[in-house]
A protein has these predicted regions:
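Ribokinase/PfkB-type carbohydrate-kinase core domain
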Residues: 1-20, 43, 80-98, 105-242, ...
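Glycine-rich phosphate/adenosyl-contacting loop at the front of the ribokinase-like
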Residues: 1-66, 77, 319
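Short pre-catalytic strand/loop immediately N-terminal to key active-site residues, enriched for Gly-Thr
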Residues: 37-46, 244-256
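Short, basic and Ser/Thr-rich N-terminal targeting/leader segments
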Residues: 48, 61, 98-100, 228
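Gly/Ala-rich phosphate-binding loop of Rossmann-like dinucleotide-binding domains
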Residues: 59, 163, 270
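Conserved post-catalytic alpha-helical subdomain immediately downstream of the catalytic base
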Residues: 218-222, 227-229, 246-319
Length: 319
């Protein structure tokens, strides 16, 4: 089995829930005088981060993630947990001069979110392309790579390294669309086989770069825009396919569903499935994560996932 190179944030998530509506609370507020406070009776602290969320969900599917990231002084226990889960920490840098990145995410009763992200140690990290710990040692095992949101300098180093190594790249800029320059965004898209973002992020990415779907597809093989409970739009040179979402039994918190989708997508890409089936598995994985409080499933019933895909789409996936 080939490996998937994953670079993204390694973080702790603080999840807060607001029983009202952010939209209602902000009605009539003058933005230049904005001062609001939300009472949150629900508090949870979880292991999170885009990189680790994707890696763990991929591992549950039976994939072999190669995780690259940075943790801080409080990251030792997180690394120990990853090792217990069978995820190598060989390329996780541990800094002694900062804390691990932390995300604080508030969700209202309509699943709207307000988030703050402190990069912590990730802002001080480095890309392991030289020295005693060198990604070149594992290059031959890597089939695909995903570059997700983290320190923008390291994102660009990752994109360039993957390009120099001829590694198939999935570009996932996420919240860092506004942290990368227009030239960096355009060059990253040009060097990628696939681009993925949610509907809101695609609007910003398109506006900033001036690129429409057809422009992305001049160089990339596909563009995936996730649409929440409406499913996924898969854009290829053949056209656009709307793939419905998989229904969850219950929605506890939507945080992490996108990362779970990416894990399913990458699992399929490594298996050389067609893009539609990759997205279907991603949708099934996302539906599992929204049923829990947190972004990383404790366990996964693979037969249940395959059955959910079959029931939703009428298609058996290869195992």
């Amino acid at each position: 089995m080939s490996r998937i190179l994953i670079t993204g944030s390694i973080a702790y998530d603080v999840l807060l829930s607001y029983d009202g509506s952010f939209a209602d609370a902000l009605k009539g507020q003058a933005l230049d005088q904005l001062s609001v406070s939300f009472f949150s009776p629900h508090f949870r602290r979880h292991h999170g981060g885009t990189g680790t969320n994707i890696a763990w969900n991929l591992r549950l599917l039976g994939g072999d993630p190669l995780l690259v990231g940075t943790v801080g002084t409080d990251g030792g226990s997180y690394c120990a947990l990853l090792e217990e889960r069978g995820i190598s920490t060989k390329y996780i840098e541990q800094r002694k001069d900062s804390v691990t990145a932390t995300a604080i995410i508030g969700t209202d009763n309509g699943e709207r979110q307000v988030a703050f992200f402190h990069p912590g140690a990730d802002a001080l990290g480095s890309w392991p392309a030289s020295g005693n710990v060198n990604l070149q040692d594992d290059r031959e095992d890597v089939a695909w790579a995903v570059v997700g949101p983290r320190n923008p300098v390291l994102m660009m180093e990752a994109v360039r390294w993957c390009g120099s190594q001829g590694i198939s790249l999935l570009f996932d800029p996420g919240q860092l669309i506004i942290g990368l320059s227009v030239d960096e965004l355009r060059s990253s898209i040009t060097m990628s086989r696939g681009v993925i973002c949610n509907e809101y992020e695609w609007g910003i990415l398109s506006e900033r770069t001036g690129m429409q779907t057809k422009d992305v597809l001049k160089t990339a093989e596909f563009l995936i825009v996730t649409l929440g409970d409406k499913g996924v739009a898969l854009h290829t040179k053949k056209g656009t396919e709307e793939i419905p979402a998989c229904s969850a039994d219950t929605v506890v918190n939507p945080t992490g569903a996108g990362d779970a989708f990416r894990a399913g997508l990458l699992f399929g890409l490594e298996k050389k499935w067609d893009r539609t089936d990759c997205c279907r598995l991603g949708a099934a994985m996302g539906s599992k994560v929204v049923e829990i409080e947190g972004t990383q499933l404790d366990s996964l019933d693979l037969e249940e996932v395959w059955e959910q895909v079959r029931m939703t789409y009428g298609k058996e996936l290869s195992k």
